[in-house]
From Swiss-Prot:
Catalyses which reaction(s): Endohydrolysis of the N-glycosidic bond at one specific adenosine on the 28S rRNA
Pfam families: RIP
Free-text function comment from the UniProt entry: Ribosome-inactivating protein of type 1, inhibits protein synthesis in animal cells. Inhibits cell-free translation in rabbit reticulocyte lysate system with an IC(50) of 0.17 nM.
Disulphides: 32-115
Matching InterPro entries: Ribosome-inact_prot_sf, Ribosome_inactivat_1/2, Ribosome_inactivat_prot, Ribosome_inactivat_prot_CS, Ribosome_inactivat_prot_sub1, Ribosome_inactivat_prot_sub2
Keywords tagged on the record: Disulfide bond, Hydrolase, Plant defense, Protein synthesis inhibitor, Toxin
Protein name: Ribosome-inactivating protein lychnin
Keyword set includes Disulfide bond: yes
Keyword Hydrolase: yes
EC number, as in UniProt: 3.2.2.22
Assembly notes: Monomer.
C-alpha cells in the first residue's frame, strides 16, 4: 500500500506518487507509457496511508480504482480508541455495507461524513474555493490534525479532503501539480490558482485526447498537460 510520511522530503513524496500511479495502473496496459486507471464499474479501491511524522498517527484514504476519486478515509476515534471507517454522504449508502472489505482493519463504521465528495460541496463546506485554498506540507499537517480522532464538522472534513485530494490524487494525475507541491509547498504554503484547477477540471477530457493521440499520433497539449502522470480509462 502506498504510504507517505507528510514531511518536506521531496524525493520520498515523488516516490510515493510514482508508487500510487503504479497501484492505480496495476493490471491495465499503459498508454504512451503512462499508467491507466481500472475499467469503470469495477468494485476495487486503492488505499493510501498518510502518516504524521511527529506522532505516527495514520489516516488511510480510499480512492475508487476506476477514477481516483476519494470516497472516504479511516482514522482512530480518540474517545473509543477504535479504528473507524468514514464515508462521504453521497458514497455512504453504496459503501457502508461493505466497509470491512474496503478498510479491512476498521473496527467500527462511523455515521456518514457531514459533506459529499464533490468539489462543489467540499468547497461550500470548507468556505473556500480550491483556487484560494492553501496547499503544502504544513497545510496538510494542520488539516490532518483537525480531523484525526475528532468530532467531524463539515468544515474540518472538507478542508482535509480538499487538501489531501489535490496533494495526492490530483498530483498523481498531473506531474505539473506534483512539481508545484515540491517547488512551492514543501517549506511553505501556496494557493492552487486557476492553472491547477483548470487541469483538475479537465482530466477526463485530457485523458481522452491522450488515448486518441497515442493511437493516431498528433494531438495538441499545453506544457502542463504534457506532464500527465495517470490516465483515466477510455
Amino acid at each position: 500500500r502506498p504510504s507517505w510520511t507528510v514531511d518536506s522530503d521531496s524525493a520520498k513524496y515523488s516516490s510515493f506518487l510514482d508508487s500510487l500511479r503504479e497501484e492505480f495502473g496495476r493490471g491495465t496496459p499503459k498508454v504512451c507509457n503512462i499508467p491507466v486507471t481500472k475499467k469503470a464499474n469495477n468494485d476495487k479501491f486503492v488505499l493510501v496511508n498518510l502518516v504524521l511524522p511527529f506522532n505516527r498517527n495514520t489516516i488511510t484514504l480510499a480512492f475508487r480504482a476506476s477514477d481516483a476519486y476519494l470516497v472516504g478515509f479511516q482514522d482512530r476515534d480518540s474517545k473509543t480508541n477504535k479504528l473507524r471507517a468514514n464515508f462521504f454522504s453521497d458514497e455512504y449508502r453504496a459503501l457502508s455495507g461493505k466497509y470491512k472489505s474496503i478498510f479491512t482493519d476498521a473496527e467500527v463504521l462511523a455515521p456518514a461524513l457531514p459533506c459529499a465528495s464533490t468539489y462543489t460541496d467540499l468547497q461550500n463546506k470548507a468556505g473556500v474555493s480550491r483556487e484560494k485554498l492553501s496547499l503544502g506540507v504544513s497545510s496538510l499537517q494542520t488539516a490532518f490534525t483537525a480531523v484525526y480522532g475528532k468530532v467531524f464538522t463539515g468544515k474540518n472534513v472538507a478542508k482535509f479532503a480538499l487538501i489531501s485530494i489535490q496533494m495526492v490524487a490530483e498530483a498523481a494525475r498531473f506531474k505539473y501539480i506534483e512539481d508545484q507541491v515540491i517547488n512551492r509547498g514543501m517549506y511553505s504554503s501556496f494557493e492552487a490558482g486557476a492553472r491547477i484547477t483548470l487541469l483538475e477540471n479537465n482530466w477526463s477530457k485530457i485523458s481522452e485526447q491522450y488515448h486518441k493521440s497515442c493511437k493516431l499520433g498528433g494531438g495538441q497539449f499545453t506544457e502542463e498537460e504534457m506532464k500527465l502522470g495517470l490516465l483515466l480509462y477510455n
